[in-house]
Curated annotation (Swiss-Prot):
It is an enzyme of class 3 (hydrolase). This is ATP-dependent RNA helicase CshA. Keywords: ATP-binding, Cell membrane, Cytoplasm, Helicase, Hydrolase, Membrane, Nucleotide-binding, RNA-binding, Stress response. It is a peripheral membrane protein. ATP binds at A45, Q46, T47, G48, T49, G50, K51, T52. A motif (Q motif) lies at residues 1-29. Residues 448-458 have a biased composition (Low complexity). The keyword Cell membrane applies.
């Protein structure tokens, strides 16, 4: 359905077109008319489905720009999601001159107070910082028309339920309430009953919780094996942009440092980093100055970054819902993605729980060998050389090249170049990753699947467009492709219609 059929004004339709939206997504198509009518809505939708515009467009449409009071409040679980939401609403509401502000922890509260004096009509914030401003009387919610709880299940997981309830109680009883959540645990349903008035429900069917656009695999490995296997997979699959999920802050720090030590263009984010440092890392990742982002679940919540082709779950999540959130980082906007989950032998029951929720059976992958990883690096170097020759003018270097050829064998020269462009063998750069406490064993309700292991799997590797940080362009792959697979299903991105 086109946005022009949803009852939005011309100024908003222009903003929508400028933002690159073409047709409304299912969540937008169903939600926007309901919100415009003033109904309460519960939307079960994961990040990447367009839910920010689903609630943002009708909120902007309904804002009275002559009224200086806060008329809509959006509560987000993380700083990153709050910032992204504010930026998107600002872009969409710019033509209408709607003022949108964001408040979050880790930033100078005095600057936020100064910004709040500019009388925003839409306020986005994290629960703790919103509660702080309410206590300081720098935020007043008595004129709120619409309240949005975004990523409600994640706010619940982070322990924000009490803050959320106290914030809701500061708003008028006759407000409109919109609740969005990828999953619907009992506590979220209770919020709907307690604080919403005859809400309409927009629900994604369980089979759609993980999109068909994401090819889902697992590798069975012991904890001490995972890092070497992951780097080999990166060498062979050669992703464009990758997010690696670690269970703890220490894990994220060690993984990012280990990847950097092995020559990968990587950085890690978690809650202990300053907001300024997190913002700089995220800017680099969004602008293709980083190839690999390592993150905890909390730090990565709500990230809306286009072009992520691979998600590596270095640690399997203890909660199946977190898996849904993680792989929602890829397979967006009609593009295919790949998720790969590392599973230790005693974690197979967690894998079965994920499959039960998503109704998708993950395919096993056989870890690549060191030789296959080396061939992957060489193939990537071939691509880099092809691209350099095609794009750069080399005339000024021809004389120097001829002199080198007079004193050196051509094969030796090319071999030296390839040696410089590829990474050292893993054995030459040992990386120690501290073992994490293993997840407790679950009751073996899914024992019928307990014998799954990599002996049934094949090599599902993909060669595609790995951006070295010296230059971020795409290229076609014509060298060194590895296809050994016992499955007819291939990890390559399938042809898009």
């Amino acid at each position: 359905m086109k946005f022009s059929e949803l009852g939005l004004s011309d100024s908003l339709l222009k903003a929508i077109k400028r933002s690159g939206y073409e047709e409304a997504t299912p969540i937008q198509e169903q939600t926007i008319p309901m919100v415009l009518e003033g109904k309460d809505v519960i939307g079960q939708a994961q990040t990447g489905t367009g839910k920010t515009a689903a609630f943002g467009l009708p909120i902007i449409e309904n804002v009275d720009t002559e009224n200086p009071n806060i008329q809509a409040i959006i509560i987000s679980p993380t700083r990153e999601l709050a910032i992204q939401t504010q930026e998107e609403l600002y872009r969409l509401g710019k033509d209408k001159h709607v003022r949108v502000q964001v408040v979050y922890g880790g930033a100078d509260i005095r600057r936020q107070i100064k910004s709040l004096k500019q009388h925003p009509q839409i306020l986005v914030g994290t629960p703790g910082r919103l509660r702080d401003h309410i206590n300081r009387h720098t935020v007043k919610l008595d004129h709120i028309k619409t309240l949005v709880l975004d990523e409600a299940d994640e706010m619940l997981n982070m322990g924000f339920l009490e803050d959320i309830e106290s914030i809701i109680k500061e708003t008028p009883d006759d407000r409109q309430t919109l609740l969005f959540s990828a999953t619907m645990p009992p506590e979220i349903k209770r919020i709907g009953v307690q604080f919403m008035s005859d809400p309409e429900t927009v629900r994604i069917k369980a089979k759609e919780l993980t999109t068909d656009l994401v090819d889902q695999y697992y590798v069975r490995a012991r904890d001490y094996e995972k890092f070497d296997i992951m780097t080999r997979l990166i060498d062979v699959q050669d992703p464009d942009l990758t997010i690696v999920f670690g269970r703890t802050k220490r894990r994220v720090d060690e993984l990012s440092k280990g990847l950097i030590a092995r020559g990968y263009n990587a950085a890690g984010i978690h809650g202990d980093l300053t907001q300024d440092k997190r913002s700089k890392i995220m800017w680099k990742f969004k602008n293709n100055e980083l190839d690999i982002l390592v993150a905890t679940d909390v730090a990565a919540r709500g990230l809306d970054i286009s072009g992520v082709t691979h998600v590596y779950n270095y640690d399997i999540p203890s909660d199946p819902d977190s898996y849904v959130h993680r792989i929602g980082r890829t397979g967006r906007a009609g593009h295919h993605g790949v998720s790969l989950t590392f599973v230790t032998p005693n974690e197979m029951d967690y894998l079965h729980e994920i499959e039960k929720l998503t109704r998708v059976r993950m395919l096993p992958l056989k870890p690549p060998t060191a030789e296959e990883a080396f061939k992957g690096q060489v193939a990537s170097a071939f691509n880099d050389i092809d691209e350099l020759i095609a794009q750069d003018s080399t005339d000024r270097y021809e004389e120097a090249a001829e002199k080198l050829l007079e004193t050196h064998n051509a094969t030796d020269l090319v071999a030296a170049l390839l040696n410089n462009m590829t990474k050292e063998a893993a054995s030459e750069v040992p990386v120690k990753i501290t073992p994490e406490r293993p997840l407790p064993r679950r009751n073996k309700r899914n024992n019928r699947n307990g014998n799954r292991n990599n002996s049934h799997g094949g090599n599902h590797y993909r060669r595609k467009n790995f951006r070295r940080h010296q230059h971020g362009s795409h290229r076609n792959d014509n060298h060194g492709k590895s296809h050994s697979s016992r499955h007819s299903f291939n990890i390559r991105h399938r042809k898009e219609n």
